[in-house]
């Protein structure tokens, strides 16, 4: 009887500890990009962005599907280096006048020269897949998240951080990355896009759906689509559920990923 009582008490204590840690997880301070959400964005990062023909391009298609009356307003650009951290990018140079975004292509593949001046409403930044939690690289993440956020604001744009996902065979990365990005977002008054948490959610909901390329790091087409849905939801504040842009995926997969993305964003922001 005493042994049974001791086991029950231990289980209760463990439950309290687990619950406490779940509640103690850092919460984001910035939970919206504002009523005038960014319609043009520069994505600065690495191959996690450019896999599968580029997540930012898929985001443009999703935004245009949601707001067909003003398609021309939505434009996203990538500045990516394979394997790079934020410290590999020269943010000041990327945002120089007359540089990136000076022209783009419309849906008919015509070159469009954009109005001179500020080319983007927001800059979405992602560090290398391990950098925010790597013992030798995490300090650089904090330093450049701060430095680059200041540069972005100095150019009249909004800084946004993109929370990357855990490797397929290292799910324990999820919580550490979520914490690192949330802390950095809070320190710099920046919105954080919780893509990594959405990956973890889908892996629990439907483990057989492969979100990864064979290297277990980069996204499969389904992974890129999920990241697109999360980014759409975070930046616009609008649900991706029912959006007609599917990236060629089958209907059940699209429905699952759209809903998982929206649920993740609402839960992370506490909405």
Label every model-predicted segment:
Residues 1-10:
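Bacterial N-terminal signal peptides that target proteins for export
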Residues 9-19:
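Bacterial N-terminal signal peptides
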Residues 20-24:
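Sec/Tat signal peptide C-region and signal peptidase I cleavage site
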Residues 25-65:
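N-terminal module-boundary/linker segments of secreted carbohydrate-active enzymes
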Residues 35-38, 49-57, 135-143, 171-175, ...:
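Soluble non-cytosolic domains of exported or imported proteins
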Residues 50-136:
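Conserved SGNH/GDSL esterase-like catalytic core that processes O-acyl groups on lipids
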Residues 107-224, 233, 240:
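Alpha-helical cap/lid subdomain in secreted, periplasmic
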Residues 218, 228-271:
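Conserved catalytic region of serine esterases and O-acyltransferases that act on ester linkages
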């Amino acid at each position: 009887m005493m042994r049974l009582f001791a086991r029950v008490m231990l289980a209760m204590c463990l439950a309290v500890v687990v619950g406490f840690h779940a509640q103690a997880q850092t919460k984001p301070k910035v939970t919206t990009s504002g009523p005038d959400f960014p319609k043009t964005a520069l994505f600065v990062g690495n191959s996690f962005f450019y896999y599968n023909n580029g997540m930012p391009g898929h985001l443009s298609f999703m935004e245009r599907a949601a707001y067909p009356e003003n398609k021309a307003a939505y434009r996203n650009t990538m500045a990516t280096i394979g394997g790079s951290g934020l410290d590999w990018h020269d943010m000041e140079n990327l945002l120089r006048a007359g540089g990136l975004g000076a022209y783009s292509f419309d849906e008919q593949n015509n070159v469009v020269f954009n109005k001179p001046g500020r080319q983007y409403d927001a800059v979405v930044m992602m560090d290398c897949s391990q950098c925010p939690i790597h013992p030798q690289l995490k300090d650089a993440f904090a330093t450049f998240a701060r430095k680059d956020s200041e540069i972005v604001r100095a150019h009249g744009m909004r800084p946004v951080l993109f929370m990357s996902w855990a490797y397929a065979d290292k799910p324990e990365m999820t919580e550490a990355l979520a914490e690192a990005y949330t802390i950095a977002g809070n320190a710099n008054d920046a919105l954080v896009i919780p893509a990594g948490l959405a990956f973890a959610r889908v892996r629990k909901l439907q483990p057989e759906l492969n979100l990864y390329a064979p290297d277990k790091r980069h996204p499969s087409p389904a992974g890129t689509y999920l990241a697109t849905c999360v980014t759409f939801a975070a930046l616009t504040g609008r649900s991706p559920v029912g959006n007609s842009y599917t990236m060629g995926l089958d209907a059940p997969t699209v429905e699952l990923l759209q809903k998982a993305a929206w649920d993740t964003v609402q839960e992370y922001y506490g909405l």
